[in-house]
Amino acid sequence: MSYVEQYYESISRLLRQTVDEGEEVLGKAADIMVHAIKEGKSLYLFGASHAGIIAEDAFYRAGGLALFNPIFSPALMLNVEPITLTSKLERLEGYGTILLESKPVKQGDVLFIHSVSGRNPVAIDMAIAAKQKGMTVISLTNVSYSKSVESRHSSGKRLFEVSDLVMDNHGEPGDAAVSVKSLSQKVAPTSTIVGSFIIHSIVLKMIEQLEEAGREVPVFRSANLDGGDAYNEAMMERHKHQIHYM
């Protein structure tokens, strides 16, 4: 089997496992978020470095939910030089709390945090601070990976241990999936593809609930379709009390 075929098999297995074993937790995540929306609360997304790709993928995207508010830090994005700065800052205790407090978060809001290892302070701090503010914390992590490493946070806790709801991407420790002949290190990470599938699956389950309740489904149209800009502007105006990125 070629390396590409091995990767395809790994991704296919993980997606199937997510549906077969994780559909209940997908539904629970959707329940939490829909309840918050109905109560006029806000939804936030966070991830550091490559984990932040999931927040980017779900935010301000054609076919995506308009109510996701990302928490981005320029110092944790992949255009930083030197790139190793992202690793140093996500290990800096207190930084996650500062980032959360830069947003208008309030009791009853929901925070979705993606961290593959779940061991670094930026995600753990943010989760702890969010819970102290009365927010609900949903985490997406690699549970087996996280259990195999020690926390870098002074509490000794990992992300899955400080979250209200834990979602598992079912990946391997180290994230990469394909063994190659010339390396001891595996190649081809799985967390981004699986994470993207998970966040969009949550949105689909949310839409099912919103439709059943007769509520508007605030989803973006492509700005490159005729009428897309006007549609999106009107929708964002209707939901401006839950949108904090404009």
UniProtKB/Swiss-Prot annotation:
Q: Which Gene3D superfamilies match?
A: Glucose-6-phosphate isomerase like protein, domain 1
**Domain of life of the organism in this record?**
Bacteria
One matching Pfam family is: SIS_2
GO biological process, any: carbohydrate derivative metabolic process
Entries under PROSITE patterns matching the protein: SIS
Limits of the SIS domain: 33-212
Name by which UniProt lists this protein: UPF0309 protein ABC0887
> What family does the database annotate?
Belongs to the UPF0309 family.
GO molecular function terms listed in the Swiss-Prot or TrEMBL record: carbohydrate derivative binding
List the source organism: Shouchella clausii (strain KSM-K16) (Alkalihalobacillus clausii)
